[in-house]
Amino acid sequence: MAIRSRTASMWHGLVLLTACLTLANCSHDIHEKRADTVKDHVEAFYDHLTHDRVAAAVRENEAIEHLSSQLGDIISRRVNRPGTNQVDREWTDLRTANETAAQNWLALGQYLSIKKQYAQSRATYQRVIDTYTGTTERTYREQAARAIRDLDILTPPPSSH
């Protein structure tokens, strides 16, 4: 009877361990899935630009921003929970999505400038300045501000006679 109880206890422990490892692996998988999703959107973004489909590229980047927004919601719901590295992983995913979207907007601004669509380029850079206001996003704002100043060189204001 003691052997049977010990065997059952061992099996229960093994099942519990397997369940824990599976859940840990699922947690890791969700982060990989998010990274793959961002990567897919980035590839589609650049493919659309390559084929001069600006509106489609914008939608791809908006999808990355939407993922970032969802992650922000997840983090804000979990912020009061002590404990796991889950929030840290969520923050990493959030930062990755934000930085990727900001870089894509900057690339779109450059693309539009090359295509001599200066007003759209300027608006794209202004979007970076207006949207990415966090302290960790300062670099992107500064790049966008410099790009706007560079656009002023390419398209000076009309002179008044």
Show where each model-derived region lies.
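Bacterial Sec signal peptide processing site at the extreme N-terminus
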Residues: 23-44
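Short solvent-exposed coil/turn linkers within tandem alpha-helical repeat scaffolds
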Residues: 32, 67-81, 92-99, 130-143
